Amino acid sequence: MAKLHDYYKDEVVKKLMTEFNYNSVMQVPRVEKITLNMGVGEAIADKKLLDNAAADLAAISGQKPLITKARKSVAGFKIRQGYPIGCKVTLRGERMWEFFERLITIAVPRIRDFRGLSAKSFDGRGNYSMGVREQIIFPEIDYDKVDRVRGLDITITTTAKSDEEGRALLAAFDFPFRK
């Protein structure tokens, strides 16, 4: 079991129960899933780029990514409906906790010119989204074998009812928010 999951059960639940005066342990917000998404718009011209992006995402997450396809045709972007244009991974359970721990302790501090993550990136329902400009911040990616530096979107979905609860949940994990 991941250390962060044990920490959540032992420390975070107690802290949030006193902070928000919950009656039951089941009311305490928890991390439900983490979604990693990599949009590869250049895949229209070269299908190999999408394979490389999927391989990077598989190395980062430890799980085979789902290839996402265009929902509708857009002439301005030269894409047709059904074209493969990206890949995504949804992490739950044990893999989610392990990735979350690696994200907080290893990957985020390796971001260039890092001054903290914005605390305003909540969606109104307690879910947090962030963008990473370079996939090379993850130690699983070998810098010498990277064909192109790509970014990815990371969404942390929680059971929190409000942004305040979601922010308190992530702050309890020492999430590096900007002061």
Curated annotation (Swiss-Prot):
One family name in Pfam for this protein: Ribosomal_L5
A cellular component annotation (GO) from this entry: cytosolic large ribosomal subunit
UniProt KW Nuclease keyword: no
Modified-residue entries (N6-acetyllysine), positions: K3
Top-level taxon of the source organism: Bacteria
GO BP terms, alphabetized: cytoplasmic translation; ribosomal large subunit assembly; translation
Family of the protein in this entry: Belongs to the universal ribosomal protein uL5 family.
Quaternary structure and partners: Part of the 50S ribosomal subunit; part of the 5S rRNA/L5/L18/L25 subcomplex. Contacts the 5S rRNA; cross-links to the P site tRNA. Forms a bridge to the 30S subunit in the 70S ribosome, contacting protein S13 and S19.
Other comments on record: Identified as a multicopy suppressor of the slow growth phenotype of an rsgA (yjeQ) deletion mutant.
Protein role: This is one of the proteins that bind and probably mediate the attachment of the 5S RNA into the large ribosomal subunit, where it forms part of the central protuberance. Its 5S rRNA binding is significantly enhanced in the presence of L18.
Name of protein: Large ribosomal subunit protein uL5
